[in-house]
Amino acid sequence: MTSRNYLLLTPGPLTTSRTVKEAMLFDSCTWDDDYNIGVVEQIRQQLTEMATASEGYTSVLLQGSGSYAVEAVLGSALGPQDKVLIVSNGAYGARMVEMAGLMGIAHHAYDCGEVARPDVQAIDAILNADPTISHIAMVHSETTTGMLNPIDEVGTLAHRYGKTYIVDAMSSFGGIPMDIAALHIDYLISSANKCIQGVPGFAFVIAREQKLAACKGRSRSLSLDLYAQWRCMEDNHGKWRFTSPTHTVLAFAQALKELAKEGGVAARHQRYQQNQRSLVAGMRALGFNTLLDDELHSPIITAFYSPEDPQYRFSEFYRRLKEQGFVIYPGKVSQSDCFRIGNIGEVYAADITALLTAIRTAMYWTK
C-alpha cells in the first residue's frame, strides 16, 4: 500500500477532487429519509434531467461496476422471444455478446473490427433482413481504442424499425452533451466513476418508464433485476433493494454539484476535448502515432501505437511514468501493440503539460 497519490490518466476509476473524497467521510443509514429522499432521490432526478428534458424517463441506481448494469439491462429488457443486435467494435461490445450468450439471449453480433467505425448501412441491412431482431445494443465511447461510435445514426435506424435501443454510455454520459429522447435511446447505461467524476461502487440506468414497466418478471438474475430495483426505489422513496454503497453515493452527489459548478456537461466536454487535443499534439511531437484517425476519436481516451524500438517495454515505460506520479493504461486492442492515455477526471491543461514532460523523461529507449 502506498501513501502517494497519482494522477490517473485512465477512463475510470479516475482522479477525483479532494471534496469528492471528503464527502465519503460521513456515515449514512440506508433506512433514513435524509439519505434516501435527501440524496438518492435527488441523484435520480438530476440524472434524468441531465439525460433529457422529455417526459417519461426515470433513473435506476444499481450496486456494482458498469458491467453489472449492462448485464442487468440485457437480462431484464429482453424477453424469451426477443433478439438483440449487438454492434461491437471493441472489448466492451464483445462483453455484451458474451453476456447475451451466457444468459441464453438470442443475439446477432455485428463485429466491424476494433479500428473501424460501425457501418450504418450494414446495420440497416441486418435489420432489414432479420425482422426477429427486437433490440439494438451498442457502446457509445469504446474505450478499447478511444472510438466514438455513431449512436445518433443508429438511433435513427432503431426508431425507423421500431426497435428498443440500448446504449452503453459508460465513458461518455456527463462528458459529452446528449439528449437521449432525441437519440431514441430507451436504456442508457453509465457509471459513477466516469465522466461525472465520482468513485467506483454503483452504476445507473436511465430508461423510458414504459420500457421498464414491461421488464417485470423477465430478469435472469435476482440481484440484477432492473425492474425490481426500479420498483423498490419508486415505492420506497429511493431505498435500494440490497445494501446501498452509501459512501460512493455521497461522493457522487458531491460530484454532481461540482459538475454543475464547472458549467454543466457542455463545459466539461470542452475541457475534455481540449485535454485530448493537447495530448495528441504533444504526443505526436514526441514521435508517437495515434491508433485512430482524428475524426474517429472521442474526447475521453486515446490509443497510441507502441514505439517500434526493440528496447521499448510497456512495463518499464509505465514504471518510469508512475515514479513521476502518472498512471496510464495498457493497450487492449488485439491486433495492434499500443497503450492508452485517458484525459477525463480532475485533469486540466497544466496536468497534460506535466504529463508530456514526464513522458519525455520516461522515454528511456531514445537515450
Swiss-Prot record:
The modification N6-(pyridoxal phosphate)lysine is found at K194. Its EC number is 2.6.1.37. Pfam families: Aminotran_5. The keyword Zinc-finger does not apply. One of its GO terms (biological process) is organic phosphonate catabolic process. Keywords: Aminotransferase, Pyridoxal phosphate, Pyruvate, Transferase. GO terms for molecular function: 2-aminoethylphosphonate-pyruvate transaminase activity. It comes from the Bacteria. Homodimer. Involved in phosphonate degradation. Belongs to the class-V pyridoxal-phosphate-dependent aminotransferase family. PhnW subfamily. NCBIfam families: PhnW-AepZ (TIGR03301), PRK13479.1 (NF010006), transamin_PhnW (TIGR02326). Its cofactor is pyridoxal 5'-phosphate. PANTHER family: 2-AMINOETHYLPHOSPHONATE--PYRUVATE TRANSAMINASE. HAMAP family: PhnW_aminotrans_5. Signal peptide: none annotated. This is 2-aminoethylphosphonate--pyruvate transaminase. It catalyses: (2-aminoethyl)phosphonate + pyruvate = phosphonoacetaldehyde + L-alanine.
